[in-house]
Amino acid sequence: MQNPPDYRNDTVLPLPLEVTADAWAVDAACSGNPGPMEYQAIDLATGARVFHFGPMKGTNNIGEFLAIVHALALMQQQGQTQKTIYNDSYNAILWVKKRQCKTKLERTPQTEPLYQIIQRAERWLNTHTWTNPIIKWETKKWGEVPADFGRK
């Protein structure tokens, strides 16, 4: 696949040569910590948004974790077992590998809906296997991850 593919319909800069276009980039944003959190995935081949979730009260790390799990589950559902996932959060990637969200967010009536989603994600991780590469997006070398919300 050409990098970037000539049919990309967005204004994202060309991908770094080390980055495969057969991939989704996922990222989260949170206004405050905790605060309103949301996440999304962008298809690197087309620049199209694959999914978006939120906002709901949470933390950035939780959003990054859930974005990766959401991408894994959707890819598995679509039979895309080799598509790469890029994410810029070392913690989230580690949590997915350990199949557990190690958040310190206080569990309160306000955060309970998010905790239910976290439990569902952990249950999915513990009952499924995947072969999709999950790769740390190297922001210092490559610039912001294409799924970035641009709020810094």
Task: Describe each region flagged by the PLM.
Residues 2-62, 74:
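RNase H-like nuclease fold core
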Residues 57-61, 65, 107, 111-114:
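Flexible, glycine- and charge-enriched loops at secondary-structure boundaries
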